[in-house]
Amino acid sequence: MLIISPMHNEAEHIEGVARALAAQTRPPSLWVVVNDNSTDATGEIAARLAEEIDFMKVVSTPASSDVDSADRLAVALEARAFNRGLAAVGDISDFTHVGKLDGDVELGPDYFEQILAEFDADPELGIAGGWILECKGGEWRPTPSAPEHVRGALKLWSAECFAAIGGIVERLGWDGIDETLARMHGYKTRSFRAAEARHFRETGSADGRLRGHVRWGEAHWILGHGVLWTAARSAKVARIRPRGASGAAYLYGYARAAALRVPRVEIDGYRKFVQTEQRRRMSSAIRAAARPGRADSARVV
């Protein structure tokens, strides 16, 4: 199992992430930390940890001139750093799985053991991951998502699936594109509640909450999401802090991308596949909401 962790200014979290990986009941064969142009002590701490953890390797990326440092999400620098880590490894044919782990995510001690067991139990499983816990009001609480969506912060691909989809693309929305391509190739994508990880930075907050929601809306335009689906989705987003403004920012990002004709994913059959899935999920949500006592099960994510 190969794990790659793009890290930008994660000096506060990297040691905890490393200790959690070293304590895994099934640790990775190789963990590549990509110091992505950090301006804090991330590189120095990573180098020290690599002397202690035998499966850890550190690589650094050159400075990027094409990005506002406050808007790394827009140009998918995380995906770019991941691919540079992959290139540094070279031949990955000996690995059964390839994973991405963010530099602010601490895994439970048996996290990989549980996820790998799911792969062993289902040969059709292509992408898997656990649930993220975030600290809200002093308590670690799960941040639910659709069962078929795996958060980009802790994805694990089977080697066969990763090869079939051609790895990950370096553009906004990469962590939705890979899942759709996997399902188009006949693989399942699943998140599993029993496997938990603590996320020390709220999802979408690294570039500022509202900017993150704008980029989220733009990403969903790129991914080929339909207008009705996006409108329904915005109602859920609006419940995220800052309430109301988050939903408006999300819709603005989608509408602006549409107005600017931001290029969408242009793969034969891709958009039709996406919108067919969305119609199915919306129909299921409507049916669930119509059942007495089942309104809570109607979720559009």
PLM regions and their residue ranges:
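Non-catalytic, C-terminal membrane-associated alpha-helical segments of glycosyltransferases
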Residues: 211-301
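Conserved nucleotide-sugar donor-binding
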Residues: 151-166
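Conserved donor NDP-sugar-binding/catalytic core segment of glycosyltransferases
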Residues: 91, 106-141
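Active-site-proximal specificity loops/subdomain of glycosyltransferases
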Residues: 54-95
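A conserved acidic beta->alpha catalytic loop
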Residues: 35-45, 63-65
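Short aromatic/hydrophobic "clamp" motif used to bind/position activated sugar donors
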Residues: 98
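Short beta-strand/loop segment that forms part of the nucleotide-sugar
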Residues: 28-37, 57-61
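Short, acidic, metal-binding catalytic loop of nucleotide-sugar glycosyltransferases
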Residues: 19-28
